[in-house]
Amino acid sequence: MASNSWQFAGADDESDDDNFNPAPADMSDEENNDNDEETTHNHRPAGKTVRQASSPVPDEEEEEEEHDEEEDARPAKRSRRDHHDDDEDEEQDEEENEEIDEEEEEDEEEEEDEEDEDDVHGGNRRKRRNKDRRAAFFDIEAEVDDEDEGEDEVGDGEEIEDFIDNAHPDDIADSGRLNDDRRHRELDRRREMEASLDAEKQAEILRERYGKRAPARGYGDMAIVPRRLLLPSVEDPSIWAVRCKEGKEREVIFSIMRRIEERMGTKNEVPITAAFERGGINSVMKGYIYVEAQRQNDILVALDGILNVYPRSNMHLVEIKDMPDLLRVIKTPNLEPGAWVRLKKPAKHAGDLAQVIDVTENGLEARVRFIPRLDYGVRDDPVFQADGKRKRPGVPGPRPPQRLFSEAEARKRHPRYLQGNPQTNSWNYNGDDFENGFQVKDIKIQQLEVKNVNPTLEEVTKFASGAEDGTENLDLKALAATLKDSAKSVAYVPGDIIEVYEGEQQGVIGKATNVQGDIVTLQVTEGDLAGRTIDVPNKGLRKRFRIGDHVKVIGGSRFRDEVGMVVKIVDDRVTLLTDQTNTEITVFSKDLREASDIGGQGSLGQYSLLDLVQLDATTVGCIVKVDRESVVVLDQNGDTKQVQPSQITNKLPKRKFAVAADRNGSEIRLDDVVREYGGQQRQGKIIHIHRSYIFLHTTTTNENAGVFVTRANSVTTVAAKGGRNTATAGPDLSAMNPALKRNPTASGKQMPAPRTFGPDRAINQTVVIRRGGYKGLLGIVKDTTDTHARVELHSRGKIITIPKADLSFKDKVTGKTIDINQRGGSRGGFGGGGRGGGEFGSRTPMASGGSDRTPAWGSSRSTARTPAWNRDAGGSRTPAWNDGSRTVNPYDGSRTPYGGATAYGGIGSRTPAWHSGSRTPAPDSFGHGSKTPAWSAGSDSWGSKTPGYGASAPTPGASGDAWGYTPGASGGGNSSSAYDAPTPGGGLSAPTPGAALNAPTPGAYSAPTPAAVSAPTPGAWQGGWGSGGDAVSAPTPGALGAPTPGAPGYADDD
C-alpha cells in the first residue's frame, strides 16, 4: 500500500513535469536563470529539462501569456498536493513563498541587466518600460511554483560564455560622447563668430535672442510711491536706543539673532521686530544698539540675560524724524598723501591747516604735518599763564602763535628734553616729533576735518619749501585737489569777469550774466566767441582781474575786508597793495571781487587805527583794523576781536609820560625800542603802556597791522628814546621796601660780604624765589656761579637758572629767612658794636613775660636767652646748677654750663677759674708788678694802652656805659679810660679772660654776639651796677651764675 502510494506520488510528479508548459524558443535568460535557481533550492534531480537561452527578448504580450499560463497551472498543481500530508504541505508552502519573494527581486535585477546588454548589442536604445513606484508595495507578479520551474543546471562553459563579454570597446562606444564633442565645437565656433562682429550686430543678435521673452512678473504695486509715504509714522513700531558696552555692539546683535532662532515657533518667541547697530571706530553712535518693537517692555523681555547690554538703564526713544538717519550710510572720506585737512584735536591746534603725509592701511589714522605752536617759554609751562601768574593745572592758556620749530631755542630752554639728528633735521622735543621745522603726528581720521578745508594762500605758503634759487615750491596738484571741492562754494555774481581755465572752452573770458546752481551763464567779451552767450559749470571757472583793478578781499582769508589795488597776477594768485597799511598781500582770486568803494583813511567815527580803547572794566585793546562798519581789536591777552563801535566803552587817551620798568628794572617809555626776553624775541617800538602791559609795533610782520602785546617785565630795552641812559634812569626800588623804611639803620652803609674760599655756601641751601615767573616757589640750590644759581624746584622737580639777587635763603627746619654770609649773631648799630635797635620785632625770638619760656626769659628788652634762666625754675636748667656735677672748680666743682657762666657776662665764663691764685697774668689788685703789661688806672685813658689793665676793662666791653664801644672798658663811665677801651682790661681790674664785675668776653652792654639787650643769643643781665636789675640771674651763658670754671663768690647775693 505504501509502495502504491509512493508510485502514485511519483507518477503525479512526472505528470506535473510533463504537463508544465515547455519554455518557448525565445525564452529569456531571466526565466531560465530563475528555473535554475529553483532547481537548486528544491534539490531536484538534474537532466529532466534543459532550457537554452535565446537571444531575442520576448514581447510584452508573450510575457503576459506566460504569466497567465503560470497562474492557470498553479491551481491544478495545488489540487494535486492535497493528497499529501498536511505537514508536508505547510512546509512546502512556506518554502514556496520565500522563494517567490527572492525570485521577484532577482527578476527585476536581471531584467535591467538584460536591457543594458540588448542596448549594447543592438546599438539602438529600446524604450524602457516605466514601472510604477507603487508596485513595490503590492504583490502584482505571478507566483511560480518551484516545481513548475526547471531544475536543469547550466553547464560551466555556458555560464562563462554568458559572463564574459567578447565585444570590442570600439564597437560598443557611446555615440552620445561624439555628439557632445561636436556640440562643444559648434558652440566655440559660434562664440568666435559673435566676437568678430561689431557691437551693433551683437546687440541685434542679443535682442533677437532674448528680446521676445516676457519680463518677470513683479510682486506688489508697480506704481511710483512718494518718498514721504515711505517714512515711518506713529503706527509703525518704535525704535529705542539701548546702551551697551562699547565695542561689543555686533556681539550683542548676534546674541539677539540666535535667541530669535532658538525661540522661533515656541510660545516664548522674542517680541521684537528688528535690531541693528551703527558702531565702529569712526562712528558717533558706538556704544548703542537700536531695537525696534511695539512696546518698551518687549525690549526688556528680549534682552533679558544677554551680556554686554544694559536695557534697564539709559534707554532712549528715537524720534520719528530721526529714524531715517539711523539707516543712512555716510561714505568714509578717502585721504591721499598731499591732501590738505584741518585739525580738530588737540585743542591747541584746533582749526590749523595740516598736510597728509601717509595713511594707514586700515584707513583709521593718518600721519600729518603741521606748523607747531611753541613758545619755548613760560607759556609752555602748564603751571603758569602768559602773564607769569600761577594757575590751576588743566586750565587752557592762550595759544602760542604758529612758528616753525627752532632747535636753537629749544636747546636754550629745555636741553634735557631735546633729542634728534641735525643732519636729517629731525628732532624730538617734549615727546613730539619735528621734521624740517614741522610737527609730525599720527591722528585719527575722525579728528580731522576733510571737507570744506578752504586753505588760504598764506597758510599754504608756509608749507612751501624753498628751491635752490630761492623760489617757492608749491604742490599745486595737491592744492588743486583740495580746492576742487571748495570751488563749488565760490559765489559768482552777475558782473564778475570770469575765465574758463579747464575744459573744452578753456581760455574763454567773459562777464557773468546769470548764475543758477552750478551753471554760470557767460557773455564772452574776448576771442572768437565774442558776443556769444555760453553756459559753463562753475568747477572750471575762476575770477579774472587786471593790474590796476581796485578789489576787496571777501573770502576766508585773514585779510578779509582789506581793500587795495592789484599789482601782480600769477595764475590764480593775486597780489594787491592795501589802502590802509600800504603793504602787499597775496590771496587767491576766488577770494576777491571788484570794490566800488575806495579805502578810507583808517578811521571809523572817533576811532582810528592803533587807538587804545576800553572794551570792558578789565579789558583794553588796540585797534588793528578798521572796516566800514566794525573794527578789529587786539586785546591785552593777545586775542583779536571784531567789535562794533557801540561795543567800545571809551577811547583811552595816549599817555605820553607813561613809565614802566623792564625786566632789568630800567625805565621804559613810549617810542622806546624793546625786545622780548623769551619766546619769539620779537622787537618793536612801544606805542601804548597800560598798567603792566605794553603794545608794540613792528615792521617785520603784517599780522594785526604789525601790532603785538606783551608784559613790561618780559622785555629788555634795546634803544631808549632820546638816547637817555637807562642804567640809572630807573626809580629807587629799595625805597619801596617797607622793611627798610621800618629799620632805616639796617640799610646804612654796610661792608660787602667777605670773600670766602672753598665751595659756595649757597649750595644745598633752601631758597624761595622772590620775583619773576617762579615767584614764591621753594627749591634747593644745586650749583652756583658768581651771579646766578641753578635751583631745583620742590613742586616741579625741574632745575632752573635764576639770579642770586632773586633768591631768599630759608632755614631748613624753622623756615625763617637767614643770611648765609653772616657769621654768628646779628650786628646792631653802626659798625656792628652797639646795642642795636630797640624794637621787639628785631628780636629772635620775641620776648614775653613768661619766665619758663625757652629761649625767651623775660619781659624786658633783652631777649632770647637759652635755656631759661630763672633760678626758681632750677629744674629746667641743663645741667642743673649748685650740685655735685659741677666741674672743675677749686671750691665746689666747675658748673657746666649753667647761669651766666658761658660765654658772656658772668664769672663762670672765665677760663680757668678766676680766683686770684689762678688769674693770669694778674693775681690780684695789689700785685701791680705782675700785670702784663701794667698800667695805671689814673693815667691817661687816651693812650690806647694795649694791653692794659684797669679796674673794669672787659674784652671787648664792660658794663661802664650804654654806648657799647668795642672794645670798651669803664668803671664808672665818667673817666676818660672808659672811652679808651683797652684790651684786655682796664678800669675795675678786669683780668683776661674774666673780670670781677661781670666783664665777659665779648661784652655785655655793647651787644655783640652774644649780647644782652638787643636780644642776642646768649644774652646777659639787664643792667649795670645800681640799675636795679638782677645782675646775678644770668641765663646760660650769663653772668655770675655757676661759672665754668669760676668761683662762687658773690654770685649768691640774692
Curated annotation (Swiss-Prot):
SUPFAM superfamilies noted in UniProt: Translation proteins SH3-like domain
Keyword annotations = mRNA processing, Nucleus, Transcription
Name it: Transcription elongation factor spt5
Compositionally skewed regions (Acidic residues) per UniProt: 27-37, 58-72, 85-119, 140-155
**What Gene Ontology cellular-component terms does the record carry?**
DSIF complex
Q: Where is the composition biased (Basic residues)?
A: 123-132
Give the Gly residues compositional bias ranges.
825-840
Q: Can you say where in the cell this protein is located? A: Nucleus
Against PANTHER family, the record matches this protein to:
SUPPRESSOR OF TY 5 (PTHR11125), TRANSCRIPTION ELONGATION FACTOR SPT5 (PTHR11125:SF7)
**Gene Ontology biological process terms in this record:** mRNA processing; regulation of DNA-templated transcription elongation; regulation of transcription by RNA polymerase II; transcription elongation by RNA polymerase II; transcription elongation-coupled chromatin remodeling
- Domain of life of the organism encoding this protein: Eukaryota
Q: How does it assemble?
A: Component of the spt4-spt5 complex. Interacts with RNA polymerase II.
One example of the protein's molecular function in GO is:
mRNA binding
Q: Which CDD domains match?
A: KOW_Spt5_1, KOW_Spt5_2, KOW_Spt5_3, KOW_Spt5_4, KOW_Spt5_5, NGN_Euk
State the similarity comment: Belongs to the SPT5 family.
Task: Report the principal subcellular site.
Answer: nucleus
**Pfam families listed in its UniProt record:** CTD (PF12815), KOW1_SPT5 (PF23042), KOW2_Spt5 (PF23284), KOW4_SPT5 (PF23291), KOW5_SPT5 (PF23290), KOWx_SPT5 (PF23037), Spt5-NGN (PF03439), Spt5_N (PF11942)
Q: Which InterPro entries match?
A: KOW, KOW_Spt5_1, KOW_Spt5_2, KOW_Spt5_3, KOW_Spt5_4, KOW_Spt5_5, NGN-domain, NGN-like_dom
> Region (Disordered) spans which residues?
1-155, 387-411, 726-759, 819-897, 909-1054
Biased composition, class Low complexity, residue ranges: 1004-1020, 1034-1054
Q: Give the species this sequence originates from.
A: Neurospora crassa (strain ATCC 24698 / 74-OR23-1A / CBS 708.71 / DSM 1257 / FGSC 987)
What is the purpose of this protein?
The spt4-spt5 complex mediates both activation and inhibition of transcription elongation, and plays a role in pre-mRNA processing. This complex seems to be important for the stability of the RNA polymerase II elongation machinery on the chromatin template but not for the inherent ability of this machinery to translocate down the gene.
